[in-house]
Every structure is written in C-alpha cells, then in structure tokens.
C-alpha cells in the first residue's frame, strides 16, 4: 500500500489483548479522528489506552483450549462435565494467566467483581462486556456493576 500511496501513514497497535479492549481502541480511534487530532496524537493516545486496559475473562467451555493444546482433551472434557469455570487475565507481556478455578457461574462472576476491587477499579472508566454464547452471565455481570456507576457497553 505504501508503494502505491507513499503519503499514507500506517500505525500498527499491538494491544496484547482481545475482545472489549479491541472495541475500546476502535472507539477511541474513531472519536479522535472525528476530533481531527493529529496522526501522532492519535497513535500516542491509542498506545496509552492499550497500556492501561485490564482484561478478565471467564471460560465455561474448554473445547478451544483442548483443540489448541493448552489443556489435555480428557481434562477439558471432565472440567466441562463438572461445570468448572476458569478466570483468566492478560499479563503485562500479553500472555494468558488462568489464575482462578471454581465450579459454577455465580462464583466466577463474584471473583470478577472481587478482582476489579483488587485492581482498584475506580468506577469511572467504561467496562466493556462481551460474551460468546452466555448472554445470561453477561447480563448478571452488567447488573452487578450497575450500582458502581461505570459506563457499561
């Protein structure tokens, strides 16, 4: 593309993240572009945003972890049958840390709220909730966060 359009500027942002953080970065980029910010200012703001995000995710299915070799297939099958849930987070270097295991949806959602408290979530920054096949859990989390007042999307 640069060969055909050398006047174009390209910035590649590695968020070391997924899901809501990517949506948040896209929203921020769109907002800053709409405000006619300079290219360099937009790049700086996006990098700062990526460095400040926190990612927590809960898994109820171990199928994909088993398929890509992160867990043994038998272990994944048994964990699913036992209604196991794992809570994961992004480490500063972008790796996945599965740091909490429990049985049942309620316990893992409670741990998400507890972790947000431990991370000193201020209730000011938006919380982006995304789900894949578990809208009920997303709604429960949404309602649990509602009293604290963050912008929820």
Stretch-by-stretch model annotation:
Residues 1-11, 17-27, 31-153:
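Mixed-charge interfacial surface used for oligomerization/domain docking
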């Amino acid at each position: 593309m640069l060969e055909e359009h050398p006047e174009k500027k390209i910035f590649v942002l590695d968020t070391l993240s997924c899901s809501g953080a990517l949506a948040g970065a896209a929203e921020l980029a769109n907002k800053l572009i709409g405000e006619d910010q300079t290219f360099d200012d937009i790049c700086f703001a996006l990098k700062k945003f990526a460095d400040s995000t926190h990612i927590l995710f809960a898994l109820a299915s171990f199928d994909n972890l088993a398929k890509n070799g992160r867990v043994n297939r038998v272990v994944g099958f048994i964990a699913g049958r036992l209604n196991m849930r794992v809570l994961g987070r992004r480490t500063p270097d972008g790796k996945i840390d599965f740091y909490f295991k429990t049985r049942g949806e309620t316990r893992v959602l409670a741990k998400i709220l507890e972790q947000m408290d431990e991370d000193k979530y201020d209730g000011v920054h938006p919380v982006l909730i995304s789900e894949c096949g578990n809208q009920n859990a997303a709604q429960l989390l949404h309602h649990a966060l509602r009293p604290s007042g963050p912008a929820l999307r």
